[in-house]
Swiss-Prot record:
GO terms for biological process: enterobacterial common antigen biosynthetic process. It is an enzyme of class 2 (transferase). Catalyzes the synthesis of Und-PP-GlcNAc-ManNAcA (Lipid II), the second lipid-linked intermediate involved in enterobacterial common antigen (ECA) synthesis. Pathway: Bacterial outer membrane biogenesis; enterobacterial common antigen biosynthesis. The lineage of its organism: Bacteria, Pseudomonadati, Pseudomonadota, Gammaproteobacteria, Enterobacterales. This is UDP-N-acetyl-D-mannosaminuronic acid transferase. GO terms for molecular function: lipopolysaccharide N-acetylmannosaminouronosyltransferase activity. The keyword Signal does not apply. Its EC number is 2.4.1.180. Keywords: Glycosyltransferase, Transferase. It comes from Pectobacterium atrosepticum (strain SCRI 1043 / ATCC BAA-672).
Amino acid sequence: MTALKTTETIPLYTIRGLPIHGFRNMGTFVDYLFAGERVETGTLVAINAEKVLTAEKEVALRTLLDRAEYKYADGISIVRSIRRKYPQADVTRIAGADLWEALMERAGKQETPVFLVGGKPDVLAQTEAKLRAQWDVNIVGSQDGYFTPEQRDALFERIRASGAQIVTVAMGSPRQEILMRDCRHHYPDALYMGIGGTYDVFTGHVKRAPLVWQNLGLEWLYRLLSQPSRIFRQLRLLKYVAYHYSGRL
């Protein structure tokens, strides 16, 4: 079963010209990806307001996003915009960090081979150890984020030779999207997921917002209070707020 065949049944919502797949909840998403004899192939990309704005300015990123089979609403602002534009939409926010953990748990149960890319060497090692201890994940290979452009082809060959069915890349956007795109040219038979700083959160090196903040859609505010230097990034999002309330979605 291929990603292109199955995505035909997933509701699609367009925000600023970018198609986004909508799911009722994360469990439905995970079940969908694992519905066949093996996990689906393709690329998972989290969409938030900042990424929408960046894609409008950077053609290369927009092209990468357009080619990704699964674009899901990670940011609460995207969910609210979908509901505003499509009042009948049954869609919820799916945080990338939570989705990754759910995929790893399911991969452990189904013995799905996983390859991890990105992060600092010590954080990556801790991530591997915790995944094996917590969910018995079959990790068939890993590579920290400190490799040169000249080493990329060798990494792609390692991923192909490992037989991994899930490849998660923690390098930040758009580096991780570029790496996944290029790796898929060498090895298309896997599900690729860009996960930013998720390894740091998973291993406790970075503290995530408390659940009550997450449920209120205020995780962005918690991060801002924890890291005041993010204020300039947040100010950029005023443009998206204008899009939302003016109906230019």
